[in-house]
Amino acid sequence: VHSHPGGLPWLSEADRRLQIKSALPWWLVCRGDIHKFRCVPHLTGRRFEHGVTDCYTLFRDAYHLAGIDMPDFEREDDWWRNGQNLYLDNMEATGFYRISLPSAQPGDILLCCFGASVANHAAIYCGNGELLHHLPEQLSKRERYSEKWQRRTHSAWRHRHWHASAFTGICNDLAAASACM
């Protein structure tokens, strides 16, 4: 447990490096509130394993670092080919509302159709034409929100408790991961 008196309720870049090194959950006291952070792997450089470390896990862990906890869903590989629509069926129930793509801000979720007609891939919009995501058979990464990804984008979503400063928790992890390389 440590505190950020008068600071932000997210782990700093140094906090994230030390948390990863300790492999322990961290508790942060800020403005009289206790914020609990599971020790999740850095958001970039993760190996893909469907249902364990996939695009939803990245989305869930990024939001955790931003102070919003998301449920974990049991999901079989290729669920989108079996008539399921897990993202669209769960976004509103977990606190998200649909926004127009031009109004997307850093931290908003982009649902994409990746080799499917159903929204089966989630990415976190980072602003400045970048997204953070995790594709099968690749390491999780930041990349340009290119025309290819714009064509695949099904919809954009924002959490009802999101505020712009929450993206700091995600950025601090990205910076901490870069410093570790």
Positions of predicted regions on the chain:
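Short HxH-centered metal-ligating active-site micro-motif
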Residues: 1-13
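Short helix-to-loop capping/linker segments positioned immediately adjacent to catalytic or ligand/cofactor-binding
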Residues: 43-51, 98
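Divalent-metal-activated hydrolytic enzyme cores
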Residues: 19-41
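Surface-exposed patches in mature extracellular/periplasmic domains of secreted proteins
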Residues: 70-75
